[in-house]
Amino acid sequence: MIYDLGEIEELGIFDGINEIIATTEDETGAPNAAPMGVIKEGDRLSVRLFAGSHTRDNILAAGKFVANVSHDPMLFVETALNDIPEDRFVERDGELTLSDAEAWALFKCEPKDLDIALPEAEFVKGEVLSREFRAVNRGVNLVVEAAVAATRYVALRSDLYLEEIFRIRRIVGRCGGSKEIEAMDRLDELMEQAIDD
């Protein structure tokens, strides 16, 4: 278990915007998972929250979230536009995490800071669950970017986001493997469902 902010890079969180999957619970204990940006600038940590999201509401209520580090493109797609089954969640050291996470980190957000879009976050503890060496896969990173664009398209209905997703799809077709291409196909399905709702 890691408790020192100076060792947070061991959990896969570096300077810049780290796209993670946040796990939270609502007041009834129902789990939620959604992609979210954890921003690290030296020793300063903040999160990007969007009004109207379950994640923001749950963080407001509880004052905390767990950042799950993953390189699974399908997990980002499913959590961006869909509710995942409860069996995908597991409790570790008293905190709600994802069963497929490679690492997790618990953060606190003070309720007084949550009325702004970029509240500061405080690292509490975390754990590395698996250490796999991998080269950078452009396809995985682009699927994550497409999932973010899809959430914005569904919320705002701006064609700019749709054009971005089409551009990304072409590159994923060249740079990604079968998992990334399958994740993009699933993203299309989930976007259609979200738009029809």
Predicted regions located by residue number:
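Basic, polyanion-binding surface patches
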Residues: 1-104, 108-197
